[in-house]
Amino acid sequence: AMIIAANGTAQNVQRTSQGIKYAAQGMNVSVEFYSPSIVRVYKTPGETASDKESLVVIKAPEQTPVSFGENGKNVTLSSQMIQVEVNPETGGIYFFDKLGQRLLTDKDYGTQFTPFNDAGVPSYNVRQAFLLDKDEVIYGLGQQQTGKVSQRNQKLFLRNQNMSICIPFIHSIKGYAF
């Protein structure tokens, strides 16, 4: 199925029961509500989705009422707790609370998959960019030996070492986590 944007151009966005799927910037993207307050964004390189079972995401999606709409060239999805706006052209994904306050921006053109050879196994280096509020503090990423509690403006190469443990999970003082 195609969604026709308000400006009359067809976007390659397929609606699912609890979200959308589309291709943008050389990757396949799925945005699915797992509950009224949980949205899963799943990105894979290339134009076809990966059917690999996640070792991390074990929650089955709850039956969640989702409203679909448009905001210019963007597609909107809303539950009773969260609104998500997607730009299928740039790959940008914008998250808002139920009052319309912006929580997080998955930056336009912010995701990159760079192929590399990992000891004979084809793999990817992944770069992901987010825009935070000016004074927003974020915590997480595991046990890092940087002497910093806030991970704001830190550049980290996430890999496990003897005294450094990588856990790719971030929590914001605004109450969301990813």
Regions found by a protein language model. Give the residues of each.
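N-terminal accessory segment at the very beginning of proteins
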Residues: 2-178
